[in-house]
Amino acid sequence: MFPLSSHHRLLAGSRLCLRVALTALACCGVLHAGSMRFESAGTYVSNDTYYLDAFARVDLGMEPIQALVNGVELHFLVRLAVYKTRRWWIDTPILERRLRYRLDYYELTQHYRVTDAQTGKSANFRSVAAALRELGSLSRYALLPAHEINKRRQYVASIQLELDVTRLPGPLMAQAIRSSEWQLETEEFRWSLN
């Protein structure tokens, strides 16, 4: 067996320290089950386009964070919709969209990466808290052209965020589907578009 280099010993030591810290926090009750909730969402018109700004507070909890630092990619799904409200019938959707994001941890450089699956753009963060703030933020997202909205009708927009457990590796997915720690999603957040 080959001796470990100082770099490999440092990485192994930092991984062990992280696991010990997570276990200690869990035993003390400091770490709790994760949660997600939208704190704000709204639309505005600029240059004949409706834009969306939204912010969700995302707290993963212990099991998803442990999986993340052990190399498991976490996938998130944002559901957007705009409905034309109807007084005596079901609201009619005029826009339904799904946005996908991925969160990775890179042990060698000890950073977290958030990737937008639609554009391929990514951003790196030194802490999981900073990466989760980015995941929960949607800023100046072009929703739909203003001419598609009839000013004499009422419209409602909605947004929802969830941790997509169907994208986890097989054995972990089977466990996650049964575990409440992995069932993370926001309530549907609705607001009047006009």
What does each model-identified segment do?
Residues 64-129:
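Structured domain cores in non-transmembrane regions
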Residues 34-74:
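N-terminal onset of structured domains
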Residues 45-50, 106-109, 147-156:
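A short, structured loop/turn motif at beta-sheet edges
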Residues 53-56, 107, 130-145:
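A beta-strand/beta-hairpin structural motif
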Residues 14-29:
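Bacterial N-terminal signal peptides
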Residues 36-42, 62, 98-100, 140-145:
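Short structured motifs
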Residues 143-194:
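Glycine-rich, aromatic-bearing surface loops/beta-hairpins
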Residues 1-13:
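N-terminal secretory signal peptides that target proteins for export/translocation
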